[in-house]
């Protein structure tokens, strides 16, 4: 192998002449590839006596290693040149102002809850909360809801077993509050509730706000005046409002409240009524001495009406394009 040293010298010279990584790779293939000059030297070993082959093979491998080291060194140098050139072209002016972080915003339903809490807080209402996993007594029995009522059915309610369920309303908190304290009582109860329903205007989980007053000489007139003031404050306009007779097991008389929409049609916004005497008796309050009114409304429903949202499900999809409109 008299010309092995010459091949190594030519390879090193070619390595130094390569001006970029692509050209350098061509040199590697030419000398160290499967059919490269140095690789083919291994085929000449068969012409040597067996006892000379190990030494000759070691010489060839040493030559290949020298060329590989030269390739590695040249590649590192070329990549360094490219990196330095790119860094020079991407010089950052550190005197420029930093990139400002975008401020977040409250979810529209949270805005609605906060707005309602503020209004009723100014009227002396306190905010109460309670468990979302409820028992049938607080969710149904104490509220004068009979055993055969459709709300108890499996297709409407998420039951864990025969006595425990995901609450279908926040009214259970009213029961707990009336049992824990004597009148006068003035509370609102915001929270998540669960019903087995899902379409454009219903979701299995939604937010509800209920209100309750219990005191002496509370009348339906007090209820109407409170809700008139609330709705006009919430929608920020002098709305046309009507009360329709309705039925709820826990209030008597009961009503549903509508507001006149911009399209000239009535829109239902909440339900209300005077607390049923049986409910007061169930919590140990004498209905001959005290009376009260209660109301309940869906937060998503009010938010849809306030902001003109047509699909309830948009509130739960976390689409920033939608949510940024409410910042």
UniProtKB/Swiss-Prot annotation:
One of its GO terms (molecular function) is phenylalanine-tRNA ligase activity. One of its GO terms (biological process) is phenylalanyl-tRNA aminoacylation. It comes from the Bacteria. It is found in: Cytoplasm. Binds 2 magnesium ions per tetramer. Its cofactor is Mg(2+). It catalyses: tRNA(Phe) + L-phenylalanine + ATP = L-phenylalanyl-tRNA(Phe) + AMP + diphosphate + H(+). GO terms for cellular component: cytoplasm. Its EC number is 6.1.1.20. Its main location: cytoplasm. Mg(2+) binds at residue 252. PROSITE patterns: AA_TRNA_LIGASE_II. CDD domains: PheRS_alpha_core (cd00496). Keywords: Aminoacyl-tRNA synthetase, ATP-binding, Cytoplasm, Ligase, Magnesium, Metal-binding, Nucleotide-binding, Protein biosynthesis. InterPro entries: aa-tRNA-synth_II, aa-tRNA-synth_II/BPL/LPL, Phe-tRNA-synth_IIc_asu, Phe-tRNA_ligase_II_N, Phe_tRNA_ligase_alpha1_bac, Phenylalanyl-tRNA_Synthase, tRNA-bd_arm. SUPFAM superfamilies: Class II aaRS and biotin synthetases (SSF55681), tRNA-binding arm (SSF46589). Belongs to the class-II aminoacyl-tRNA synthetase family. Phe-tRNA synthetase alpha subunit type 1 subfamily. Tetramer of two alpha and two beta subunits. This is Phenylalanine--tRNA ligase alpha subunit. It comes from Yersinia enterocolitica serotype O:8 / biotype 1B (strain NCTC 13174 / 8081).
């Amino acid at each position: 192998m008299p010309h092995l040293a010459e091949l190594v010298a030519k390879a090193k010279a070619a390595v130094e002449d390569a001006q970029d990584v692509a050209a350098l790779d061509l040199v590697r293939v030419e000398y160290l590839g499967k059919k490269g000059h140095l690789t083919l030297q291994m085929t000449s070993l068969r012409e040597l006596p067996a006892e000379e082959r190990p030494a000759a093979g070691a010489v060839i491998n040493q030559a290949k290693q020298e060329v590989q080291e030269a390739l590695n060194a040249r590649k590192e140098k070329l990549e360094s040149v490219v990196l330095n050139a790119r860094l020079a072209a991407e010089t950052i002016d550190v005197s420029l102002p930093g990139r400002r972080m975008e401020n977040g915003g409250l979810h529209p339903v949270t805005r609605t809850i906060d707005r309602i809490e503020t209004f009723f807080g100014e009227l002396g209402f306190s905010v109460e909360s309670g468990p979302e996993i409820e028992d049938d007594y607080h969710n149904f029995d104490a509220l004068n809801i009979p055993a055969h009522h459709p709300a108890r059915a499996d297709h409407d309610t998420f039951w864990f077993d025969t006595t425990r369920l995901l609450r279908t309303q926040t009214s259970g908190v009213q029961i707990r509050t009336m049992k824990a304290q004597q009148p006068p009582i003035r509370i609102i109860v915001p929270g998540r509730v669960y019903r087995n329903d899902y379409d454009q205007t219903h979701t299995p989980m939604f937010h509800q706000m209920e209100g309750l007053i219990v005191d002496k000489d509370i009348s339906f007139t007090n209820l109407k005046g409170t809700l008139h003031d609330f709705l006009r404050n919430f929608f920020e306009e002098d709305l046309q409002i009507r009360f329709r007779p309705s039925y709820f097991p826990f209030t008597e008389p009961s009503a549903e409240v509508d507001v006149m929409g911009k399209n000239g049609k009535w829109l239902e916004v909440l339900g209300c009524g005077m607390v049923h005497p049986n409910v007061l008796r169930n919590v140990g309050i004498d209905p001959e001495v005290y009376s009260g009114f209660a109301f309940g409304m869906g937060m998503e429903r009010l938010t849809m009406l306030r902001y003109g949202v047509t699909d309830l499900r948009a509130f739960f999809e976390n689409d920033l394009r939608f949510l940024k409109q409410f910042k």
